[in-house]
């Protein structure tokens, strides 16, 4: 009987943990809102980093999910840049976007860094060379995308 009572007590004690989160207690709301590019639509933003193994592992699942979104939902990838050594991989993503080959090379770049271990995520020369080779582009065009004014604007957001 004591064991049964103890089991019931343990079982019901977890119910106290299932509480609705409260603003100011469990999380803080911000005064600033984030503007979206898709007005009147739900915008899902993935913050990722090419050096992150978890982002790499999650990417195929996100792609599948993004292929089947409702019409009122958009999906956008944004490279995270909390530290200086993450800037170069963010530049790589934005360069792929600028060059119009992000859909073709995004997954392959993840593979080159994590699966094939061809270079580090912050090796600018290697990233430019890899994009030039795999995008079948002129090296100066890729370098220009890496160093453009629009790149600086994207990085400062």
What are the language-model segments listed below?
Residues 4-84, 156:
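Extracytoplasmic thiol/disulfide redox context detector
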Residues 82-157:
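Cysteine-centric redox/oxidoreductase cores and disulfide-bonded domains
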């Amino acid at each position: 009987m004591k064991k049964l009572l103890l089991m019931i007590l343990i079982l019901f004690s977890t119910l106290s943990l299932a509480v609705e989160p409260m603003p100011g207690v469990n999380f803080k709301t911000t005064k600033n809102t984030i503007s979206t590019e898709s007005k009147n639509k739900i915008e899902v933003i993935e913050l990722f980093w090419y050096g992150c193994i978890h982002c790499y592992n999650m990417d195929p699942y996100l792609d599948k999910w993004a292929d089947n979104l409702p019409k009122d939902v958009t999906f956008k990838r944004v490279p995270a840049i909390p530290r200086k050594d993450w800037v170069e991989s963010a530049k790589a993503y934005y360069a792929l976007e600028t060059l119009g080959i992000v859909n073709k090379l995004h997954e392959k770049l993840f593979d080159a860094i994590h699966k094939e271990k061809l270079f580090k995520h912050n090796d600018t020369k290697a990233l430019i060379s890899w994009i030039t080779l795999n995008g079948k582009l002129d090296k100066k065009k890729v370098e220009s995308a890496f160093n453009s004014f629009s790149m600086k604007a994207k990085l400062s957001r």
